Amino acid sequence: MSIDTIEKPPAEQPLPQIADKKPETAEKLVIFAWSGELDKLWPTMILATTGAAMGKETTVFFTFWGLFPLVKNEIRLTGENWMQKMLSMMNRGGDQHMKLSKMNFAGAGPAMMKHLAGEHHVASPHELMEMAKELGVHLIPCQMTMDMMGLKREDLIDGLDEPAGATMALAQAQGAITLFI
């Protein structure tokens, strides 16, 4: 097949008018926060606060590694059995202890990112989390993941919604802009 054999539409045929059609906009934004790394939590919280500021009902569902930034910074060891305790020792929770997914450089990478953000007046993930609470963003920890990883409600920061499961998250996602980060 060559370019010459492709049938061309008649020149007089009008193009469909799409300018008159208004795009449908979702009134809800649901973000599944699966990663607990700094460079993933940052855009998660930027998008959540922006969505709420635009008037969208915004929900962030924190699951698996995404739960660890919700752990209080002063909590060092969580879990009931040795596997859960090892997990918490190797993946310290809290928004002050997050690593970068790339170029972590033994902790120097996050420090450089935070420094650059400060120079350019970019709110930190901690500040964005506080803004999200003030804007009414639903910050929902995954109950199943909490149970699996040995996290209790008192291990998590204040101001979160009640822990819930995937059924609730998927129900919230109906008709919403949905992101998985």
List the predicted regions and their residue ranges.
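N-terminal glycine-/serine-/threonine-rich phosphate-binding loop
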Residues: 2-40, 46-49
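Short, glycine-rich nucleotide/cofactor-binding loops
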Residues: 31-41, 70, 115-120
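Histidine-anchored nucleotide/phosphate-binding helix
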Residues: 42-55, 60
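Short internal beta-strands
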Residues: 58-64, 140-143
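Glycine-rich loop at the start of a catalytic domain that most often binds anionic cofactors/ligands
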Residues: 70-80
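A glycine-rich helix N-cap at a beta->alpha junction
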Residues: 78-117, 121
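A charged, amphipathic interaction segment
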Residues: 106-167, 171
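Short hydrophobic/aromatic patches at helix-to-coil boundaries
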Residues: 178-181
